[in-house]
């Protein structure tokens, strides 16, 4: 069964009911970010049932290239980039109604660097990683959820061996540590991870030498932390390897490097752990598009290859439902979000054939069940 989401130009009223019903703990809010150089409008909201794997379209909002978005912890606000490679590059704050799925733009602020491709928030600040700008920008949040203008800007460097893709600085990811004391940013073109200290007042600083070097020609892309906060895992776009780190009070110590992309297509993309921390998934693009699956030793953080799931074309981003039952892959060039059921015993994936068809999907985010 495939859900066609307004790809034929139908209005939202024709695609969705005007009222929604509270389906209990199994009903999630789901938000989809897209590239808008085709027929896609911007951000789309759905109701997703994490028991059955079915999706119901609710609303959309027009926004240019919202290629990455992040909900606030309470789900009332959404922060989304506009990944534009010019002066219109921005980060946007939106109000979100979890009951109806309605999205409403509150305000936008320009990012000091072009092509913002990642956004994160701790409820007080918002970070953007600006790929073409080669920098990370910081925005303070007002009490009403809106963004203040950018206050700080931290630049990456470029000294990697790839004379095409590492010739200028690129920052691909910026996120807060689980303990909230630090910020980590992937310095793609310098093959390193930058570490910043975050004070209780929200001041951010980086001392000389506060960077974690990795192997040359790696192209660090996305970083994620284990549920228990003891380990971190990095997907490297160019080398196609996952690096496992032990994490203690701001320190990342490498414990393993293992291939996620055996074809060396230089297009690895996203990385996530299952909610129980027992399995890790990493997506690959350009050749052999799919998701590498690993088991995780939750005691020492070591990964073991468990399988590989072919997907649609260009799985730029994916996410796992809070109950761990489903993995949804946003396959940009197949214009589809594929819904996979997870085997919680071995981590393997099974295509449910409950595709969500939407033009150029590149980000999937969930908000926990809503309550009256």
Predicted regions and their residues:
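Short loop/turn segments immediately following the C-termini of beta-strands
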Residues: 35-37, 83-85, 131-133, 141, ...
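Beta-rich, blade/repeat-based domains predominating
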Residues: 39, 63-74, 112-123, 157-179, ...
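Short loop/turn segments immediately following beta-strands, especially the blade-tip
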Residues: 47-53, 94-101, 139-148, 197-204, ...
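A short beta-strand motif characteristic of beta-propeller blades
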Residues: 56-61, 104-110, 151, 158-165, ...
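Asp-box/WD-like beta-propeller blade repeats and closely related beta-sheet repeat scaffolds
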Residues: 102-173
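Bacterial Sec-dependent N-terminal signal peptides
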Residues: 1-27
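Blade-loop segments of beta-propeller domains
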Residues: 57-123
């Amino acid at each position: 069964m495939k859900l066609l989401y307004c790809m034929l130009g139908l209005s939202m009223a024709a695609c969705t009911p005007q009222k929604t019903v509270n389906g209990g703990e199994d009903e999630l809010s789901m938000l989809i970010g897209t590239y808008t150089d085709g027929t896609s409008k911007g951000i789309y909201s759905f109701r997703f049932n994490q028991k059955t794997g079915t999706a119901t379209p609710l609303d959309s909002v027009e926004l240019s290239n919202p290629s990455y978005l992040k909900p606030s912890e309470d789900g009332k606000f959404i922060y989304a980039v506009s990944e534009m490679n010019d002066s219109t590059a921005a980060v946007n704050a939106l109000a979100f109604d979890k009951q109806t799925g309605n999205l409403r733009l509150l305000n936008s602020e320009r990012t000091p660097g072009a092509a913002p491709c990642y956004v994160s928030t701790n409820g007080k600040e918002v970070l953007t990683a600006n790929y073409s700008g080669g920098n990370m920008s910081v925005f303070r949040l007002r009490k009403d959820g809106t963004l203040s203008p950018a206050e700080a800007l931290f630049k990456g460097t470029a000294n990697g061996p790839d004379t095409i893709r590492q010739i200028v600085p690129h920052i691909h990811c910026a996120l807060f540590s689980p303990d909230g004391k630090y910020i980590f940013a992937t310095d793609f073109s310098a093959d390193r991870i930058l570490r910043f200290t975050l004070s209780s007042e929200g001041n951010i600083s980086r001392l000389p030498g506060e960077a974690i070097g990795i192997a040359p020609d790696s192209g660090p892309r996305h970083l994620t932390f284990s549920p228990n906060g003891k380990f971190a895992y990095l997907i490297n776009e160019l080398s196609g390897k996952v690096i496992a780190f032990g994490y203690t009070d701001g320190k990342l110590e490498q414990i393993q490097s293992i291939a996620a992309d055996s074809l060396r297509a230089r297009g690895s993309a996203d990385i996530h752990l299952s909610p129980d921390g027992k399995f890790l998934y990493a997506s690959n693009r350009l050749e052999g598009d799919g998701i590498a699956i690993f088991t995780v030793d939750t005691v020492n953080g070591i990964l073991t290859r468990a399988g590989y799931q072919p997907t649609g074309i260009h799985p730029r981003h994916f996410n796992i439902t809070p109950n761990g039952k489903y993995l949804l892959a946003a396959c940009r060039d197949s214009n589809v979000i594929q819904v996979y059921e997870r085997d919680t015993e071995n981590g393997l994936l099974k295509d449910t054939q409950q595709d969500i068809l939407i033009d150029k999907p590149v980000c999937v985010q969930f908000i926990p069940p809503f309550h009256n």
